[in-house]
């Protein structure tokens, strides 16, 4: 470690795919920057830069947080990460889908980006074992722009579904994960084993301080990911897990009419849980009691409603678990919360939304939601245009008046600037077709949220 010049020894081997994890708990001072590097048999890594959280009782003048999500390797290049590496940031929040569990699957993508397709060790298009997940992480982390961004800033990671399998959930009847689009669906023991292997690969390749038991044989005992981080007294961030404990999708596990574009009444069932009972209590109570100037909630999936009349566009988000969302909002409204900042991803879109008890105009605001755009993964505009079925951003904004804006046709990243007075959201489009550190980039949107004033331009 620099600048003190301390040396920390750690080992590695095939049991962790030759990856290294060095936990420096209690060895660093709060609120300061550090440089670090790795040395092995005379070979020295590039120098990395990080910083520790501000200590309790301090009020930083400002925080700048990078927001990214959904970085499918085969759907574009990582020029946005080269730009992110050069930003002045206190941390990067990765809102899930660090990898996608497939490669070269002709059902999903045509080869557009040279050098981005590869076959998994199993020969399958979808990951079916630990070796496949490890190969995916090695491929993604081979990208030089991702390496630069990881070395430039400290990161906070949460996962979504593609670190394991698309639209995954927990099935309480089989005590195993569900994965509606995976060939192991209907085979609970195989899915349970695969989940354990996906979790293991995640801990090997993703630098996150989580509770992990490598010998556990049940996913919920193996890892607990939800946690809280305090940036002094300015922002307390509640990092949630919206995949490991959630109920099956309320309208069924099919596509159109069930997981997408659904109308079933089960969406409002009190039995539908996104968080599970224990995580729900942890979030509801601790966020309500937080003394921080701003209370941050990271949700891998969209928190606010996205509907067209009676049609729910995506039951994989909180709309499929609406009763639990309503219970949280009611509790926070009774507690007088007005400084909530929700950070979300998953939808391959960017948006800003009013957060209020029923999301109706004129209500007192609890806070605002800001969604990070996908880094490379195709957005709904790109996907639905192939089906000649893209209604447009304006249609979705009109159908959902709580939205300040919706952009389903953007790739890039966002920056959140937090001060005691306001939260500012800067949205950047970056051309994913250019494999260069200076890939074209432009500011697409700039908003701020202030309690009592709502969302404003600027």
Please annotate each region the language model reported.
Residues 1-458:
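Metal-dependent phosphoester/phosphodiester hydrolase catalytic core
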């Amino acid at each position: 470690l620099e600048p003190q010049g301390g040396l920390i020894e750690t080992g590695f081997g095939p049991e962790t795919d030759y990856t290294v994890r060095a936990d420096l708990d209690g060895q660093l001072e709060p609120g300061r920057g550090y440089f670090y590097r790795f040395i092995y048999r005379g070979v020295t890594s590039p120098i990395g830069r990080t910083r520790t959280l501000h200590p309790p009782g301090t009020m930083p003048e400002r925080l700048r947080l990078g927001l990214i999500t959904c970085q499918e390797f085969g759907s574009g290049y990582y020029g946005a990460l080269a730009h992110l590496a050069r930003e002045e940031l206190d941390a990067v929040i990765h809102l899930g889908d660090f990898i996608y569990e497939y490669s070269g699957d002709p059902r999903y993508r045509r080869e557009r980006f040279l050098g981005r397709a590869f076959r998994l060790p199993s020969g399958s298009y979808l990951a079916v074992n630990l070796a496949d997940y490890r190969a995916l992480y090695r491929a993604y982390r081979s990208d030089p722009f991702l390496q630069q961004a990881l070395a430039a800033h400290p990161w906070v990671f949460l996962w979504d579904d593609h670190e394991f399998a698309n639209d995954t959930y927990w099935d309480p009847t089989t005590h195993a994960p569900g994965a509606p689009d995976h060939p192991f669906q209907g085979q609970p023991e195989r899915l349970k084993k695969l989940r354990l292997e996906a979790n293991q690969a995640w801990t090997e390749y993703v630098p996150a301080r989580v509770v992990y038991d490598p010998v556990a044989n049940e996913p919920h005992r193996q890892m607990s990911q939800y946690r809280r981080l305090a940036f002094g007294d300015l922002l307390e961030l509640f990092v949630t897990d919206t995949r490991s404990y959630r109920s099956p999708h309320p309208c069924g596990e099919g596509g159109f009419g069930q997981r997408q574009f659904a109308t079933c009444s089960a969406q409002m069932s009190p039995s539908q849980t996104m968080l599970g009972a224990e995580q729900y209590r942890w979030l509801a109570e601790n966020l309500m009691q937080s003394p921080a100037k701003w209370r941050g909630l990271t949700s891998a999936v969209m928190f606010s409603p996205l509907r067209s009349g009676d049609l729910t566009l995506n039951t994989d988000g909180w709309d499929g678990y609406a009763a639990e969302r309503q219970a949280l909002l009611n509790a926070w409204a009774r507690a007088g919360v007005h400084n909530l900042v929700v950070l979300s991803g998953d939808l391959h879109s960017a948006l800003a939304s009013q957060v209020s008890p029923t999301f109706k105009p004129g209500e007192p605001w609890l806070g605002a939601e800001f969604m990070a755009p996908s880094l490379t993964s195709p957005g709904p505009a790109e996907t639905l245009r192939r089906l000649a079925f893209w209604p447009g951003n304006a249609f979705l904004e009109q159908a959902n008046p709580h939205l300040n804006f919706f952009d389903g046709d953007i790739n890039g990243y966002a920056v959140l600037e937090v001060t005691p007075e306001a939260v500012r959201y800067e949205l950047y489009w970056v051309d994913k077709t250019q494999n260069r550190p200076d890939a074209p980039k432009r500011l697409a949107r700039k908003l701020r949220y202030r309690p009592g004033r709502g969302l404003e331009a600027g």
